[in-house]
Every structure is written in structure tokens, then in C-alpha cells.
């Protein structure tokens, strides 16, 4: 194999494909990246048997071929190379020479024939939508994905297609996030759960322009095609929470608040909260203000924030991080807050429509909180 390309072209491919490479594996080949040069195209693949990423770019190919190079070392070498054209050549004994400027490296490659093939996705039912929309749907829900492996189904986001509606849902037992979007050309109703780790990689790959991302799920795997990059990952089996039943239908109180002002107040009160001192924040709604306070072993904090509407003497506790993550994800200038009582969840939603819904369960307050 022999090809050349600009350093940035090669580095971009490596930065994407290497995200699917495991650090340690009983199969040494899985610690490597598969490089395949053919015609005027270089394809680099990373795979950990659960998620695979294959990404392609045009390069100057002199001799086609396929090899596997250790991902960590190869990526580190390319990052340190000068900004110039990179020349890569492999001889018949798999000795690979990498040249760039005055830098020269010789690495022993592995045979590519034993590198496992990415999972096949047997589906002709695809969904297409602009990359920024999928990116925002992931960003506005992924923080609610559970990290508790005892219930694997909730370590991913549920994608639910009903009619022309796409809903992305995440839940971790303490909060629930739903992001809704109207899409065109949907293949029919379906549900599937995509691992949170895979969605975080997809979010990194997605661009901010209006290019299309194509999504093809089957019964076991799902394929995301994003320009010259393809990501394939296993789906998670199991029974996802009936999230509609979890969202209250009736509330005693409904007010609105300036989202940024609310965030800033909570951030200030949270300054005395840490990983070791995780006391909840006490929210005291009284009149048209919410008074926030917190007590930990290192001190006390207090602030207050106005809102539109009126609530008489409601006191409720929340985990500061859960509330902040929901408010930051919302994005709107004004948000609607709906509450029922001190032991009921709070709902954060837009002033109009139902583009997103965030449910946060309260924390039972103690006298010294």
C-alpha cells in the first residue's frame, strides 16, 4: 500500500475512527485501525465489536492495499507531524514507513484479513434529517441517560417514530428528558434504543450545516451515515420506561421564568455544593419569587429569582445538577415551570408547543438542609 495526503486530512480521519477503538482487548487487532486504500480513496475503520466507525476521504493512492496499525501510536505520530504532506508506504513484509517533512517513522503493521467486519444492517427503512436537528436532539437529552448498568435499557436514548413525529427520550431514574421534532419521509412507526456512548460519538461527528444524516435501524443494529462517515452500533434490548405515564397531566402551579436568570441564581447557590457535599438546594416559592438556599458543612448560600405568576408558600428540594442540566439544554429565553407539590416532580417546558419536556424528581428535604 502506498498513498499520500495532507496531514490534516489524515488526522481528521484518525480522530473520527479512533473513537471506536478499545484501549485493551483480548483481540490485539481491535487495538488497531484498519487502513484501506483503493483508487483515490482512503478508508479508516475502528471497531470494538459493539460500535464501529468507518470514515473516508480522497487521497493520492499509488498502490492499493489494506493494513492494520496500532491506533494509539499511529494517531500520536500523526498528531506530532509537521503541517505538510504525509507519505505512507508498506512493503511486502508489512513494514510501514511514514514520512512527513524531515520526520520518518517505521512501524510494523498487521495483516488486515483477520480484522473483523463491521456488523451488517439489514434494513431498507431509512430516516433522513438535517444534521443540526439530530445533533440538538441528542444534546438536549443525552445528559439524562443512566450510567447504571443494572438496567442497560436506560443507558441509551429511545428513538420513537410515530407518524411524522420523532421523539428522543432519556431517563435515569431521577429525571426524564424528551425532545420532539416533526420529520418528513419517515418509513413507518418504530422504536429502538441507541447506546448513550454511541450517541455521544455521533454528536461529535455531526456538523452544523444542513447536510443530511441517514439512519437505518434493523432488529439488532443501527447505521448512521454522515457524509463520508458511517457509524454502526448495536441496539439495546429491553423494555423502555413508559415515559408518557411518568409525566404528570395535572398541576397546581404554572409559572414562567427567565431561563438565564434562573440558571445564574442556581449556579451561585451551588457554589458550596461539591461531589462530597451533595446537599440539595431548597426552592421556596413565595409570591412571585423563588428563594433558593443551600446548607453544607462548609457554609450557607442564598439567592432569589423572580418569575411571572404566583405561588404561595411551596417548598421543594432539587439536586442542583439535574435542574441546571435541564435548564441549560432548554435553550429558550423563557421557560415554563409546572409543579404540583413538594413531593411531586417539576416539569420544564417551552412557553409554546412541546418541543422538549424535562421532568426532575424532587429530593426529600431534611430540617437541616
Where are each of the predicted segments found?
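Structural preference for solvent-exposed beta-strand-turn elements
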Residues: 1-369
